[in-house]
Regions:
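Glycine-rich phosphate-binding loop and adjoining beta1-alpha1-beta2 segment
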Residues: 177, 181-208, 212, 216
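A structured beta-alpha segment of the ubiquitous adenosine-cofactor-binding alpha/beta core
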Residues: 157, 202-248
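Domain-scale recognition of functional cores that engage charged ligands
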Residues: 166-167, 177, 192, 206-208, ...
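Short, well-ordered alpha-helix to beta-strand connector turns
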Residues: 176, 200-201, 224, 273
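Acyl-CoA thioester-binding alpha/beta core of soluble enzymes
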Residues: 1-186, 214, 218, 222-223, ...
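Short, hinge-like loop/turn segments at secondary-structure boundaries
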Residues: 126-127, 197-200, 271-276
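Rossmann-fold NAD(P)-binding glycine/threonine-rich loop
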Residues: 238-285
Length: 417
């Protein structure tokens, strides 16, 4: 953001970040309150890790109804945790992983980090950088739109779901971008996450199974600066929205592309989430060794670190690409995956064991009160965490509250010159 501000004004700003507040932002949904009542987390009762045969563990991801139905169909049981526990105990963990994926579900076998390092997908991820920012087409250099904030006038199409991708667009919005979130009315959603990541955005429904809605999206692309998408490789491409096609529609566009396991390797098209990546890559196994729970076994991070850090890195990548477009022109592709960020996070190392004793489970009430703000949304008064990054000339803020999905029409607001 500072680089973009310097391109606008020739000045750089002073940046301040409270690291404890930044840590809280990795579990921001925990602190949501609607009309002073905590917003439920929506976690499904059967989602989690279970002992399988031969001393191994399996994880099933069940927050979305279709993924839950797929897992339960494979297991042949109803939505009951005891029944799921008994069923998974009869399965080989690797065979269950493959069966659930084949059925259209999400989950995986708990691996060690050493096992993941030898897995074909783990090796593919190891050959990639944290993210890639590549020029995919030539076009003239473009000055940033006029405005008083780093991203004023920059239009962002947000075709992402869950946490990471929506966090990217939310971050761009807090620095002045005009964000239009596009999702399908037919797609399942998770209420709390939408409340948490919807700040600063317009929201509209389009059904890309319908030709007329595809044309509407094409029209929106022609007037966009950033196209952020979080579907599995090929999903939008099959509807005519490959990065190259987007660059033809709108020369100079920045395409931000997120998936679970990267564009490389045998799992390139496999669905996945933060917790799935933790499971298969050895993170939950190692967490279980360092922080054993009441029942021995794998443990997840206490925050959604991979999801949120991926979102922040996507926003960083988009900003870098916009700066390059300003200086040298061109259309740009920012490519990143949850698995790449998970690997990068593990490479940061571990906190020494001596520093892991007597760690508080929560921030103080006084801290949380300082970090919170209240927004008046169409469905009530929402208390949530405020932006973390402090900039000396252009304070970060959202100029719109979170709204229900599909609240607006799929059109760009008129821009003032």
């Amino acid at each position: 953001m500072n680089d973009l501000w310097e391109l606008r004004t020739g000045r750089r700003q002073k940046i301040a970040i409270n690291t404890r507040q930044a840590t809280a932002s990795l579990r921001s949904g925990t602190y949501l309150k609607m009309e002073d009542t905590p917003v439920p987390n929506g976690r499904n009762v059967v989602m989690g890790t279970y002992p399988a045969k031969h001393g191994r563990w399996s994880y099933i991801h069940c927050n979305f109804p279709n993924h839950r139905a797929a897992a339960l169909k494979v297991l042949g049981v109803a939505e009951d945790r005891d029944a799921v526990t008994k069923a998974i105990a009869q399965w080989d963990a690797l065979e269950l992983e493959e069966a659930i994926i084949a059925a259209g579900g999400a989950g995986g076998m708990v691996r060690t980090m050493a096992e993941w390092a030898q897995h074909p997908q783990g090796m593919a991820i190891a050959g990639l950088p944290l993210m890639e920012i590549v020029k995919i087409a030539d076009s003239p250099a473009e000055p940033l739109p006029k405005g008083e904030r780093p991203l004023s006038g920059v239009r962002v199409l947000d075709l992402t779901r869950v946490i990471a991708g929506p966090t990217c667009a939310r971050t761009l919005a807090e620095h002045g971008a005009e964000v239009l979130k596009i999702t399908g009315k037919h797609l399942p959603s998770l209420g709390r996450q939408e409340y948490d990541t919807g700040h600063g955005k317009l929201s509209a429904h389009l059904d890309l199974r319908e030709a007329k809605d595809v044309e509407i999206l094409r029209g929106l692309v022609r007037k966009a600066d950033v196209f952020s998408q979080g579907y599995r490789p090929g999903t939008l491409g099959n509807r005519g929205f490959t990065p190259e096609a987007l660059a033809q529609l709108r020369p100079g566009i920045v395409v931000v592309s997120l998936c679970a396991f990267s564009h490389a390797g045998p799992w390139a098209s496999r669905r996945g989430f933060d917790t799935v990546v933790q499971t298969v890559s050895g993170i939950t196994h190692r967490q279980g060794e360092v922080f054993p729970g009441a029942v021995p076994g794998p443990q997840f991070y206490p925050v959604s670190a991979i999801d949120f850090l991926t979102g922040y890195l996507m926003a960083f990548g988009a900003s870098v690409a916009l700066a390059r477009r300003t200086r040298e022109g061109g259309s740009w592709l920012v490519r990143i995956s949850l698995a790449q960020v998970g690997r990068w996070l593990v490479q940061r190392g571990e906190v020494p064991a001596a520093e892991l004793t007597n760690v508080a489970k929560e921030f103080t009430p006084e801290e949380l009160e300082r970090w919170k703000m209240t927004s008046n949304t169409p469905v009530g008064r929402l208390q949530h965490l405020a932006p973390v990054v402090q900039m000396s000339e252009t304070p970060a803020y959202w100029d719109k509250p979170t709204v229900p999905l599909g609240y607006h029409q799929p059109v760009w607001p008129a821009q003032t010159s």
